[in-house]
Structures are given as structure tokens and as C-alpha cells.
UniProtKB/Swiss-Prot annotation:
Protein name per Swiss-Prot or TrEMBL: Large ribosomal subunit protein bL25
Compositional bias of kind Low complexity: 184-206
Recorded name of the encoding gene: rplY
Organism: Bifidobacterium longum (strain NCC 2705)
Task of the protein: This is one of the proteins that binds to the 5S RNA in the ribosome where it forms part of the central protuberance.
Entry-linked CDD domains: Ribosomal_L25_TL5_CTC
Assembly behavior: Part of the 50S ribosomal subunit; part of the 5S rRNA/L5/L18/L25 subcomplex. Contacts the 5S rRNA. Binds to the 5S rRNA independently of L5 and L18.
GO cellular component: cytosolic large ribosomal subunit
InterPro entries referenced in this protein's UniProt entry, alphabetically: Rbsml_bL25/Gln-tRNA_synth_N, Ribosomal_bL25/Gln-tRNA_synth, Ribosomal_bL25_b-dom, Ribosomal_bL25_C, Ribosomal_bL25_long, Ribosomal_L25_dom, Ribosomal_uL5_bac-type
Protein family membership: Belongs to the bacterial ribosomal protein bL25 family. CTC subfamily.
Length: 206
């Protein structure tokens, strides 16, 4: 289930880089809440609380400002490329019971058989879910899977109420295989045996 976070903000009517700089000096972040065909709402949010809140993937926000309350999800986050501080946040207003499409990070758990290793082929999987049930991550189990096994999008077990929403259900999400260096190190002792045998006559000849 999505993490629900409440933020207390203020409406803003001034715009521009100079205004944004002044807000950041005051430990505030400018943000915009978009709402379909309606006029967007322009707000300022507390920097520390907002920065911490944005660590949660696909969180559901309740943003209160000047007597208004809007429920929203993050649409885009702009960061300073050098300082890595948040400069602006775009939100998308949502309604209770609404289903939306989101990109969810993929993680693996479990241990494949033998020397096989799990490789994540796509970092995020697109799914559709109720705004109150947005997953923070998709976990793919690779426990006991053998070399050469692929887990396709259609095979991923999703949380209850979450639907797959990708163009190609046959797309590989995780691949299990033995790395080349592991194969070579396993074969190396066998390859060295004939060389050791060949050295014996040379030693006898001395």
C-alpha cells in the first residue's frame, strides 16, 4: 500500500528564478499541483519535510495550503545538478478511488542455483493501481532458479490490486545466468591438468 504523507504548504503568486532562490534560502521549495484541465495550484513547501518525503517511491501526498487540501502524487522532481538539492516539484492531483499508471522499481530476492546470478534487465516496471495502493517496489523471487532462466513481465507476481501495464508482456525483467568469469574459473583446473602431465616427462629427462 502507498505511503501517505501530509505536507503543510502555502499558496504562492510570485514566479521566476529570483523568487525560487529566495524561497530556497528560506528553506522552502516551490511546487506546482496539476489537475487535468483545471488551473494548476502553485504552492511552497517546507524543504526538509518535502526532501525526506520524496525518498518514498510512489507515495500519496495530502497537501494542505491556505484552507485547501489536495491529494496528489509526484509527477517530476527537478534537482540542482551540482548540489543535488531539490529546486522544484511537480505534483499530479488525484481523486480517491482513481487508478493511475506508475513506474515501480524492480528488486530481486532469493538465491539462484549453483553459481548463477540474477541480473535485472529493466529497472522499473509499469503498472496500474489505485492511488491508495501504489507499490513502492516490485520484488521478483529468483530462489532456486537455474542458469538461463528468464522472468518475463507477464510472469511477475504483483501485489493484490496491482495490474501489469506494459506494451510487451514478453519483455524480460530478470535473467538468471552464470557469469562468464565464473564459468572460466570453474573450467580452469581441468584445463591445467594436461599441462601438468606434460611437464612430467620433461622433468624425467633431466
Amino acid at each position: 500500500m502507498a505511503t501517505t504523507i501530509k505536507l503543510e504548504g502555502e499558496a504562492r503568486s510570485e514566479f521566476g528564478k529570483g523568487v525560487a532562490r529566495r524561497l530556497r534560502v528560506a528553506n522552502k521549495i516551490p511546487a506546482t499541483i496539476y489537475a487535468g484541465g483545471e488551473e494548476p495550484a502553485f504552492v511552497t513547501l517546507p524543504m526538509r519535510e518535502t526532501t525526506l518525503a520524496l525518498r518514498h517511491t510512489n507515495a500519496l501526498f495530502t497537501i494542505a495550503f491556505d484552507g485547501n487540501t489536495k491529494m496528489a502524487v509526484v509527477k517530476d522532481v527537478q534537482k540542482n545538478p551540482v548540489k543535488r538539492i531539490i529546486e522544484h516539484v511537480d505534483f499530479l492531483e488525484v481523486k480517491a478511488g482513481e487508478k493511475i499508471d506508475v513506474e515501480v522499481p524492480v528488486f530481486v530476492e532469493g538465491t539462484p542455483k549453483g553459481a548463477a546470478v540474477a541480473f535485472v534487465d529493466i529497472q522499473e516496471l509499469k503498472v496500474r493501481a489505485d492511488v491508495a495502493n501504489l507499490p513502492e517496489k516490485i520484488v521478483v523471487s529468483v530462489e532456486g532458479l537455474t542458469d538461463g532462466t528468464k522472468v518475463f513481465a507477464k510472469d511477475v507476481v504483483l501485489p493484490e490490486g496491482v495490474e501489469l501495464d506494459v506494451e510487451d508482456p514478453e519483455e524480460s525483467v530478470v535473467t538468471v545466468e552464470v557469469p562468464e568469469d565464473a564459468s572460466e574459473s570453474t573450467a580452469a583446473p581441468e584445463a591445467a591438468a594436461p599441462a601438468a602431465d606434460a611437464a612430467a616427462p620433461a622433468a624425467d629427462a633431466k
